[in-house]
Amino acid sequence: GRTKETLRSSQVTCRDIDGDGCIEIPEDTSSKKQSSEITSQNWVNYGNTVLSHKCYSFSCKRDGYILVIDDDDFSKVKANYDSESRKLTIIDKKNKSNVFEIVTLINSNYSVNDPKYKDYTMIMKNSGFVYLAKVNKSSDIDINIQTLKDMIKVY
């Protein structure tokens, strides 16, 4: 049955989030200060009656992706989402600078030659959508385009 211990409020389903072959459970860690379109999760695995931490993530249900964030960086960043431009911005809490941005576009609305996206790199293409990213190379939090390609997962 449902109890306080078994009820989860996370909209993200269980999955192998880190590629280790085991199914992890997402626990909702979203705060009221966070954009409503973005949720954050603490991923745990179950072993012999104990839940143990695996990793953290931000999820964007509207755009269909999960972004796995390194444990060391998770407490240092916050996520903002602009629903009009479909842009997720990860911000360094300490110096309030952008760490990186991810923009979601419908495939037919994207052109490599569009000057609006000249600073962005495609990190994923899925189900008619294109996901573009721009990293702040001068950020104290070291994340590059290749790292972002590894961090992003499809719902």
Q: What annotation goes with each model-predicted range?
A:
Residues 70-122:
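Secretory pathway targeting signatures of secreted, lumenal, and periplasmic proteins
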Residues 73, 133-155:
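Surface-exposed amphipathic alpha-helical segments
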Residues 55-77:
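N-terminal "mature-domain start" segment
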Residues 1-2, 52-58:
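Beta-propeller fold detector
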